[in-house]
Amino acid sequence: MRQRVRQVLVIALPIIGGMTSQNILNLVDTAMVGSLGDEALAAVGTGSFANFLAMAFITGLSAGVQTIASRRMGEGRDAETAVSLNGALLIALLIGLPLSIVLLQLVPYVFPVLNPDPAVVEQGVPYLQARVLAMVAVGMNFSFRGYWNGVNLSQLYLRTLLVMHAANILLNWVLIFGHLGAPAMGAVGAGVASAIATYVGTGYYFLLGLRHARKGGFLRKLPDADGMRTIGRLALPNAFQQLFFAAGFNVLFWIIAHTDVADQAHATAEVAAANVVLNVTLVSVLPGLGLGLAAASLVGQALGRSDPEDAKAWGWDVVRIGAAVMTVLGLPMLLFPDLILGVFLHEADTLELARGPLRLVGATIGVDAVGMVLMNALIGAGASRASMVVSIATQWLLFLPVAYLLGPGLGLGLMAIWTAQVSYRGLTALIFAHLWKQGRWMSIKV
């Protein structure tokens, strides 16, 4: 068991490190833009979320590449591990380029719907336009991430993110504030810096690919028609899953903002409390996500070796590790919520609203880890359609309608909505555990 734990951690730790570094960069970004005032911060905040939603679909390529690369590695077809990566890079170019041009034209019409404040719109529109121009690079970067994770080279993913973040912070300093002879572009400079840094990451990934993936067929040949269809079959469900998951966050905040409470000030406090609880949760679940991606690779490799029982065992082994790690990480949220919330919230009433939901998250995050690991394990086995159906159905057909009923319908407030949130995540974990135990995923051909 010790050897298996080590195998999991060798893949998972660089992924967790990379994801954590992304969150740290977001905080640095916020601090640098925050010095420009509330309008600039609101422009970047709204623009960042809109960009997350715009990019969600193309990031689905990562799962398709990882599933195929890990399967080929397990099959011993080392000369073909990077062929799916070549196909995904072409798809990222063919979809990302026209889509980014269309979005560039749509941003001035869409942004005022998200935030009607003219001062925010003035800075937010060019910020978001700069970000969407990086769509091709985002699609390619996620394709590379899937490949490195699939062939147990996740440390290259971490290394590239650190290069990107260093470039982003330097470019922020130059373009936001006008150093080294550049014009002071303010919030727009943050968007341009992020876009350039994303392309820097793509360039670095290509250099790493030439060094570490040529023997796997990198830039040597494209998949045949069946191979391209396989990438689409695996990537499309994950793309829709990512898109609906991101959109669900938007709907959740709308529900909380429209909860029937005594006055607008209380509604605003509930939105602020929810925002902090959600952001703390998103950081806390990173180890679970990293372990899930490790499970996807190990499951794919075992299936490639024609050893479905070992694949099944990998799923349960990573679940045990994930549940234990996440339960320990949840204890501070459960036992000392005010210490965590006090960093972000300074109004006593808002902190009071956030305390109960954060405790709930702390108490149940170990169960959530089970769902995260097995969802990714199923994707790694090629069952991305089943993963999509469960995720979208439980979020959109169950949780969001119940949240609307509890909030705007009955006016029960944030604690009731968060009880529904952790209950739906628990149900999702149970369904994924049932699907994993059932084992129909063992016969999927990739």
Predicted regions and their residues:
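Transmembrane helical elements of multi-pass membrane transporters/channels
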Residues: 10-26, 130, 164, 197-201, ...
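Hydrophobic alpha-helical transmembrane segments of multi-pass membrane proteins
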Residues: 16-17, 53-57, 94-97, 131-133, ...
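Small-residue-rich hydrophobic transmembrane alpha-helices
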Residues: 41-101, 138-152, 156-157, 253, ...
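Helix-terminus/linker motif at the lipid-water interface of multi-pass membrane proteins
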Residues: 20, 24-42, 111-118, 174-185, ...
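Short alpha-helical transmembrane segments in multi-pass integral membrane proteins
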Residues: 1-12, 69-136, 167-170, 182-236, ...
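Residue-level signal for short hydrophobic patches within transmembrane helices
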Residues: 5-24, 28, 50-57, 133, ...
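Transmembrane alpha-helix boundary and packing residues in multipass membrane permease domains
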Residues: 15, 19, 30-31, 48, ...
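Short runs within selected transmembrane alpha-helices of multi-pass transporters and secretion channels
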Residues: 62, 66, 131-149, 157-165, ...
